[in-house]
Regions:
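Bacterial N-terminal signal peptides that target proteins for export
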Residues: 1-12, 17
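C-terminal segment of classical bacterial N-terminal signal peptides
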Residues: 15-25
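N-terminal "mature-domain start" segment
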Residues: 28-61
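Solvent-exposed, polar/charged alpha-helical surfaces in well-ordered, non-transmembrane soluble domains
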Residues: 50, 54, 91, 95, ...
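Surface-exposed amphipathic alpha-helical segments
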Residues: 148-176
Length: 176
């Protein structure tokens, strides 16, 4: 179910990159909580929280959270993979990505470090979702559980949101 939800989120986002903003209502039970101002979110299952930059949106859909910029040009999908360990999730990352992104070309071979006291691995590249060319990056964090954050946008769009993205990424912290 998570893979179907992620695929649908990516398909809707790929369409929005070409056609403009898309709105979807959350479906299913959520492991997400928000504050009254809707800018602070937590993914309880993963054990992470984050603060949205002004104008950004978060759409919980069951165990998946899709975060997007105000113009929907950049999207980030958070989910807990089936793998129970950080190392297993990193090892199986290609298989996970290939279920949604086609013609994957990795342009960043990957780096390992820590992010806000969590083990962190990141990589990136290009590919296609439903025939639409995208640039993608993926981050794996070891929080309460392993969480994968897939970020994607049309080529050249990510740079437009670089400052906001840095602010957002620095706000991702472990809870619980």
């Amino acid at each position: 179910m998570k893979k179907l939800t992620i695929s649908l989120c990516l398909a809707l986002t790929a369409a929005s990159v070409l056609l403009g903003p898309v709105s979807a209502m959350p479906v299913g039970a959520s492991t997400v909580s928000t504050t009254q101002d809707n800018s602070h979110f937590s993914h309880k299952e993963a054990g992470v929280e984050f603060e949205l930059p002004k104008g950004w949106k978060a759409k919980p859909d069951g165990e998946v959270i899709t975060v997007s910029t105000a113009d929907d040009g950049l999207q980030m999908v958070f989910w807990v993979p089936a793998e129970n360990t950080f190392d297993a999730a990193v090892k199986d990352l290609d298989k996970e990505l290939e279920q949604t992104i086609k013609n994957i070309k990795t342009t960043d071979k990957g780096t390992s470090d820590t992010h806000n006291a969590m083990a962190h691995f990141s990589t990136g590249g290009t590919g296609e979702v439903n025939g639409v060319t995208i640039e993608w990056s993926v981050d794996v964090l070891a929080a309460k559980k392993v969480v994968i954050i897939l970020t994607f946008a049309a080529p050249g769009i990510a740079e437009k949101h670089a400052d906001e993205a840095v602010q957002f990424i620095s706000s991702i912290k472990k809870i619980g």
